[in-house]
């Protein structure tokens, strides 16, 4: 399957080939047996996106299962799953292509749930609606704000959604919903998502599922893959919408909390995720 070549090099070739096609279907596959909880993907993502406190697009959770003495641990990366039927988009009062958020189905961004920071009103409904807790609101914090001067690396430009953003107090993307976007700005330039390129164990596969010759397609065909189930029901979401009124971005993010222990994997999910898993 790999022909003695590095998987990362093959993935980059797959991405460049996909960019020459009229439409793509981006997806990610995570091989849980390979994950060693090094957090290289998380650190790489934070550095790439200039992420502030409270915003982590690529968390990796250490999850314990079973009852002593039959206890097992699993390391589970949990980015935005880029659902084909995303509850976060459905919950947005300003949804639609080019508006606050939408599921892209065409062009280079096909397969990615997009956010337009300039249109997002920061209401928090999408944050609460996501059953995977993959979204958070930018509360405007800085790691070095209590020092004499906010350090330059925290206000350095980022290129999310292929636009230049300089993060400052009370300026976009402050107050907006934020999440993983498969490093769309890197994809447009034929580059591999940062979490994929920084993984020391090569636990991630990424590419175009429409391309049956792509590495991700071949690995998925050769293995039994699963998707992650959500952790909340619609009833709880509706109740929490009312509780959002008057809340600050930081308060809303605290309402989201931890995505839950003992994640449930299944053959399919109602949200139709674009991130797949090979279980240990």
Map each language-model feature to its residues:
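Non-ligating segments of multi-cofactor redox enzymes
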Residues: 1-280
């Amino acid at each position: 399957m790999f022909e003695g070549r590095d998987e990362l090099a093959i993935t980059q070739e797959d991405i460049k080939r996909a960019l020459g096609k009229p439409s793509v279907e981006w997806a990610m596959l995570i091989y849980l047996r390979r994950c060693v909880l090094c957090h290289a993907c998380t650190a790489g993502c934070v550095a790439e996106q200039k992420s502030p406190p409270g915003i982590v697009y690529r968390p990796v959770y250490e999850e314990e299962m079973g009852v002593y003495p039959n206890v097992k641990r699993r390391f589970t990366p949990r980015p935005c799953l880029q659902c084909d039927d995303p509850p976060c988009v459905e919950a947005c009062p300003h949804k639609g292509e080019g508006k606050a958020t939408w599921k892209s189905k065409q062009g280079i961004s096909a397969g990615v749930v997009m956010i337009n920071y300039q249109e997002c009103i920061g209401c928090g409904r999408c944050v609460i609606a996501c059953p995977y807790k993959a979204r958070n609101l930018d509360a405007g914090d800085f790691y070095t704000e209590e020092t004499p001067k906010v350090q330059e690396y925290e206000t350095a430009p980022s290129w999310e959604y292929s636009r230049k953003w300089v993060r400052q107090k009370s300026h976009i993307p402050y107050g907006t919903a934020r999440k993983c976007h498969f490093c769309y700005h890197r994809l447009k330039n034929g580059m591999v998502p940062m979490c994929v390129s920084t993984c020391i164990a090569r636990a991630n596969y990424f590419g175009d599922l429409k391309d049956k010759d792509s590495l991700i397609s071949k690995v998925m065909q050769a293995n039994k893959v699963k998707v992650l189930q959500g952790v909340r029901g619609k009833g709880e979401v509706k109740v929490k919408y009312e509780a959002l009124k008057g809340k600050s971005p930081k308060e809303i993010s605290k309402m989201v909390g931890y995505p839950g222990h003992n994640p449930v994997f299944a053959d399919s999910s109602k949200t139709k995720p674009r991130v797949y898993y090979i279980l240990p």
